[in-house]
């Protein structure tokens, strides 16, 4: 939007309020529901870890149940080294857990919340099609 004041033109962005006005009650209600700094940091870290397509494929593969590193590498097309590295990152973010049986290491989703997060994400991107 362009506003003319005498001989000067002022450009006001369309994606901002033209007048600053704050609804204190609404702001207070929303602020109460915001996560604290630590929770925000942990949530952002979880999403950061999920920002890699290879790690997303690993998580989606684990929606089907527990798999060993060799199987995960085969199903995702990642090398076993890349697979292990990405699984270590997912484990440090508490998205997956592992157990060792003999000479094999098996991974699974850490809890049902991860399944829900992925299911909702997959539904969301499916809406575009």
Please place each PLM-identified region on the residue numbering.
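N-terminal leader segment of winged-helix/HTH proteins
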Residues: 1-49
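Alpha-helical elements of the RecA-like P-loop NTPase motor core of helicases
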Residues: 28, 70, 116
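N-terminal helix-turn-helix DNA-binding core of bacterial DNA-binding proteins
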Residues: 33, 37-81, 105-112
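Short, hydrophobic-biased segments on the C-terminal half of alpha helices
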Residues: 87-88
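Beta-hairpin "wing" of winged helix-turn-helix
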Residues: 91-101, 108
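Conserved segment of winged-helix/HTH DNA-binding domains
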Residues: 108-129
């Amino acid at each position: 939007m362009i506003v003319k004041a005498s001989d000067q033109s002022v450009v006001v962005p369309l994606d901002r309020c033209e007048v600053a006005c704050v609804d204190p009650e609404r702001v207070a209600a929303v602020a109460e529901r915001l996560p604290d700094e630590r929770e925000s940091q942990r949530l952002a870290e979880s999403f950061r870890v999920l920002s890699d397509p290879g790690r997303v494929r690993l998580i989606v593969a684990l929606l089907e149940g527990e798999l060993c590193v060799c199987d995960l590498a085969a199903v995702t097309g990642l090398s076993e080294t890349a697979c292990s590295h990405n699984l270590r990152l997912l484990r440090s973010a508490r998205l997956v857990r592992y157990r060792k049986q003999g000479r094999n290491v098996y991974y699974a989703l850490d809890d049902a919340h991860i399944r829900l997060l992925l299911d909702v994400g997959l539904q969301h991107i499916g809406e575009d099609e």
